[in-house]
Amino acid sequence: MSPAPPLSARAPRLSARALVRRFGGVTALDQVSLDLPPGRITALTGHNGAGKSTLFRCLSGADRPDSGQVLLDGRDITHLPEYTRARLGLARTFQQIAVFPGLSVADNLRVGAEQAGRRGSLEADFAVARTLRLLGLDHLADRPASGLPTGTLRLVELGRALSAEPGVLLLDEPAAGLDRAESERLAVLLTALAADGLAVLLVEHDRELVDRIADRVLTMSAGRLLPADGELPSATPIATAPSDGTADGA
């Protein structure tokens, strides 16, 4: 039996194909193509207004491109809503911390598991317990999120995403508000997750963190991805399944 190919050589988990997004007369995304392979951390950098947030929103399902495709494991998910993408294995965090202050840490994580379709199941209990241990939050499981420091809240939000047991993780400024020790802990954690096969897209201004953990760094400018290492960020087309044609009214 032939050995399995390295994770980085396998088909991408998430892909963008020629995405275009316009707002009035402004082109926020201009024919953007991108592949996120399993087991690798891809960092996206660029000045404010370069198109990073728009690309992130189109990939996550918070926005729709005017043209182009978003593919998850070769399946066209361009018109699928966020909650459906979550059930298919795509999770995200937000630049502004998004936790439920009135819920305990464990129940915040449970939200992620339930969004992935594990509502009220033993599978959800296991996912929450596993993620609490992974993030070192066991001792805070029953604490309400309100009043916790920024670094801990960032971990709680990351835990919500990881409790869904995704194959693709989109992180929007995950190190914002963290001190040096917390950023170090985040770097170790994300590196371990990628080594376990997770495909990660990181939008981050902390260049030290990016330089330490990213397998490749892509730069956006004026709605375009700049070539990296002499090649376009997405150079190899992949076969895709037919579009579901499902929309959520957007």
Predicted regions and their residues:
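Catalytic Walker B motif of ABC-type/P-loop ATPase nucleotide-binding domains
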Residues: 169-173
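The feature captures the beta-strand-to-loop junction immediately N-terminal to the Walker
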Residues: 45-47
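Helix-to-loop junction immediately C-terminal to a conserved catalytic motif
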Residues: 60
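Conserved ABC ATPase "signature" region
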Residues: 123-140, 188-191
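H-loop/switch region of ABC-family ATPase nucleotide-binding domains
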Residues: 204-205
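ABC ATPase NBD coupling module
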Residues: 76-96, 121
